[in-house]
């Protein structure tokens, strides 16, 4: 879908660039595939802020998206493509031959009326699901499982994808958008194709109020706060902080490595950080 620019009738309109969603379904979502969503404004169950700069925004309904695709060898037809306020990608409503409906992530080049299917050996076309071990090398995939049967976790945002670049016994080698190459078990499934809405990265919000509609509050730097609020706070006049950048809780930021998941390090063949050094 193309980008949509607006005439500069106001300062906010002048900068505004959005994705043209005119081809999407304009009605309400399927009620049986939705849930209520409570806005917590970044607070946890004790009322304390656990995520800063969140709050407000338009009320949203959560769409239950099927990331597992466990209905095997049952063809489904794409009924319509829809907007989903909970994610950057578009979603597709599919209807199986037995009448069951489900939402899936819409891949690029998937149209209304297309047929999709999940199985061990299916056609390599957008929207179909099969185990990574059965796919030909070079296939573009998204919604990749990391644990067998858990459902897709990798490459789910708008425009993202990964590429199957090799095999290693029971595992396959997958190259991610970040440049990282990692091993994934061959029995883990993935959906063929790249995720829809690749133009999402090119949108321009246009004004602060549009961020508020999305539930994002103003973000304040540490150096403009008081010492009680941030390690960089305080000082007479404008100061640079006087120490290496840290989080509000004193942990080093801006480049310090924080990954400590040693149990899965063996699955990462090429780190995304190594790619940047070349």
UniProtKB/Swiss-Prot annotation:
One of its GO terms (biological process) is cytoplasmic translation. It comes from Rhodopseudomonas palustris (strain BisB5). Pfam families: Ribosomal_L2 (PF00181), Ribosomal_L2_C (PF03947). Residues 222-278 are annotated as: Disordered. GO terms for molecular function: rRNA binding; structural constituent of ribosome; transferase activity. PANTHER family: LARGE RIBOSOMAL SUBUNIT PROTEIN UL2M (PTHR13691:SF5), RIBOSOMAL PROTEIN L2 (PTHR13691). It comes from the Bacteria. The gene is rplB. GO terms for cellular component: large ribosomal subunit. Keywords: Ribonucleoprotein, Ribosomal protein, RNA-binding, rRNA-binding. Part of the 50S ribosomal subunit. Forms a bridge to the 30S subunit in the 70S ribosome. Belongs to the universal ribosomal protein uL2 family. One of the primary rRNA binding proteins. Required for association of the 30S and 50S subunits to form the 70S ribosome, for tRNA binding and peptide bond formation. It has been suggested to have peptidyltransferase activity; this is somewhat controversial. Makes several contacts with the 16S rRNA in the 70S ribosome. This is Large ribosomal subunit protein uL2.
